[in-house]
Each structure stands twice: as C-alpha cells, then as structure tokens.
C-alpha cells in the first residue's frame, strides 16, 4: 500500500474532483517531458485496472490554464469528430480529457497547482531516436494526418499561448539585441557566427510577407513536432495519436513541417561538437516528406507545398539564432550541461542551414515528386 501523504499529488482530492471511480492502486512518473510533471495513475474499479494520465500544468510557462485547455479540448474534440466520421477508433486516435467538478478541464488544488487528467492509451509506444527512414515516414504521416484533420478548424477560436513563437523576424530582432548588449562579453569571440546570421536576415521576412499578402493561410499548428510526441501502435507501428498539445495555436503548417526536418533529418545530434558530421539526410527528408504529404497534401495550398523545403532551412536558422542569442545573454533560457553548450548547438544549426542551402534544389525536387 502507498502512503498517500507521501505522493507528489493529493490523489483523493484529484480523483474526487474528476469523478474517477475505484480505489487508487499505483502511479509511475514519466520523465520524457521537460515542462509538465506527468504521471500514469492506476485505479482498481470493481476488479478492473483503469489507467489515467495525470499532469501538473506548468503555470510558470502557461500562465492562462483556461486558454490552454480551451485550445487543447477544442482541437481534440474536433479530431475525435473526424475520426468517428471516418469509422476509426477515436479513443486511441486522440486524447480524451476528463471534466472537473466546476466544468473546467483542470483542477486547481489548495496549493494553487493546476492538474489535468486524460484517459491512458494502452498498447502504444513512443520513440526518441529515428533509427530508420520507415520510422520517420510514419512520423510524417502522423503529423500530416494531424494537419489534415484540423484543416477546417476555426482558427479564430484558438488562443496564442506563446506570442510570436515562430515570428522569425521578431526572433532576429531579439538576437540582434543580444549582440548589441553582449551581456556575457562573448560577442567578439563568435563574430563569424553573428555575420552568418546577419547575412540571412532577408530569410526572416519571407513567410511573414506571404502571410501579410494573404498567400499563406493560418492553420492549427502543434509547434513541438518531435518524434516522441507521437504514440505508435504496438501492433501496426503506425503513428495513431499526437500528444503534448500545450503549444497548439495559430501558425503555419510550414512551421511544423520545417521543425520536423530540422531535428529529424540531421545526420548528427543537436549538440554535436564536430560540425563535419552535420548534414541534411536527403533520404530522411524524402521519407518524412512522402509520409507527410500522403496524409496532408489534399488539405494544403500550392504555396504551402512550394515553401516546404525553404521552411526546413528557416526553422533551423531560427533555432540557431535562439541558441546563439542565449549564449550571448549568458545562457539564461536553454538548459546547458557545460559553458559552451549553446554555442555548440548554434554551430550545429548553422552548419545544417549551410548544407540545406547546398541541397535546396534537390529538396524541392523531392517535394515535387512526393506531390505526384
């Protein structure tokens, strides 16, 4: 038996507020997430074990839990409707959140902490490493399906939980402020990297200008399209459910696609010190693009598909200037393991940008072929 007073949460209070039946059995902490505290909790309900996922929302980052949960529940409800219309298993294809006693989808405890609960999806697994083109193609198919399912979602009903998250020009201005202020006295030693970033300032306007002209539609975007945010079915290996929806908000489909390529098609780790190992894997780019477009192409505009290759470079560049800017500011945002960590990350991103520029024509050809 657990000593309930030793638990990192008041399970009796939470269970009562979310009307969870049965007796609490056990819990396991999940350590994959970096923002919220997540637990799988099990209850014995008349001899049957029922599992739920319990999360403490990080209100230091997500200061408006009402807006946050409005986005998430709106999106998951929309996906559920699409799955049911298609005759598919909606309980496995999207997250199902429980409603608290006050009608909201989170519960605030006596300490002021906010908790949410959704039904646990069984017989699935997550991946942290892309060990084959097949895995990455399945990931592309899953995120493409996510985009397709939400292509008719009313964008005006979404809240912007993190303002200007992928406004690359705004990120560039933040970077230039970091260069000018040079708080950590590091700018002189990285002048070559600063020049690399400044030389590509014009790229930061491209997608924003297309939005301004009405050439790119705002979509529901996930904004954290990592491999481990997909639940894969244990039997079929298909990506069946997209999770970690905290950063769902209005944006461009190109942001999600480009960021997937940035982290997934790099031949080296994000913090590889030997930049000669850094390059864009064209086979992985092709695999993800093929999977993504197999699901999403009918819901995307011609302009969106035209800029898919470019968006891969832009998201990589944006990440690079964020790492370098944080290095210049004294490493105040990203967690680092050693003093030069953000600098190493920036060098890796810029090396990937340079390689993408060399391969841009081939990336565009691959995209065009995947559309046929």
List the predicted regions and their residue ranges.
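Conserved ATP-binding subdomain of kinase catalytic cores across diverse folds
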Residues: 26-30, 34-44, 48-177, 253, ...
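ATP-dependent phospho-/nucleotidyl transfer catalytic cores
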Residues: 3-5, 21, 28-32, 55-56, ...
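Generic start-of-chain signal for non-secretory N-termini
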Residues: 1-11
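Small/polar glycine-rich anion-binding or flexible loop at a beta-alpha turn
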Residues: 305-315
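Long, compositionally biased intrinsically disordered regions
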Residues: 356-359
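Zn-dependent metallopeptidase/amidohydrolase metal-coordination segment
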Residues: 321-336
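Active-site Asp-x-Gly
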Residues: 63, 232-300, 336-342
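A short, low-complexity linker immediately N-terminal to eukaryotic Hanks-type protein kinase catalytic domains
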Residues: 12-23
